[in-house]
From Swiss-Prot:
Top-level taxonomic group: Bacteria
Organism: Bacillus cereus (strain G9842)
Annotated protein name in UniProt: UPF0178 protein BCG9842_B2187
Database matches in Pfam families: DUF188
InterPro entries xref list: UPF0178 (IPR003791)
Coiled-coil regions, chain positions: none
Similarity comment: Belongs to the UPF0178 family.
Cysteine disulfide partners in this protein: none
Length: 146
């Protein structure tokens, strides 16, 4: 198993790096050049930089990921593609994307886009909380323990 992180806006990178390096599972952070950092990463953690295009990180992750790799993303489109490839896919708020829930998530995203396109407003996501982080940590640890 390898872990790939859609890292541009991922608030749980620290959890992923800490927990994965403890069990020696390699982590690849995929992020745009606009988030470039000279910060040194622990052993077993690699950062891949991609162009700042809308889906550049998603495409790179899909090139790299193999069946049974673990991907962390908040992007439903990437999650859908990764599930089809046989990957395990987690959201940073602590839930697992599945073939049972991805269709509903994509449908909700589409309907919200249509509402916005018509000039109306939609509610954004709720703020990320410490409880969300701990929920993610518990789920992540259970996924990498296998």
């Amino acid at each position: 198993m390898k872990i790939y992180v859609d890292a541009d806006a991922c608030p749980v990178k620290d959890v992923i790096i800490f927990e994965a390096t403890n069990v020696e599972i390699p982590v690849t952070l995929v992020t745009s050049f606009s988030h470039y950092s000279n910060a040194e990463q622990p052993k077993g953690v690699e950062t891949i930089y991609v162009d700042s295009g809308a889906d550049a990180a998603d495409y790179r992750i899909m090139q790299l990921a193999k069946k049974e790799d673990l991907i962390v993303t908040q992007d439903y489109g990437l999650a859908s593609l990764a599930l089809a490839k046989g990957c395990i896919v987690l959201h940073h708020k602590g839930y697992k994307y599945t073939n049972d829930n991805i269709e509903q998530l994509l449908q909700t995203r589409y309907l919200s886009a249509m509402v916005r396109k018509s000039g109306k407003r939609t509610k954004g996501p709720k703020p990320f909380t410490a409880e969300d982080k701990e929920k993610f940590r518990a789920l992540f640890k259970s996924m990498i323990a296998h």
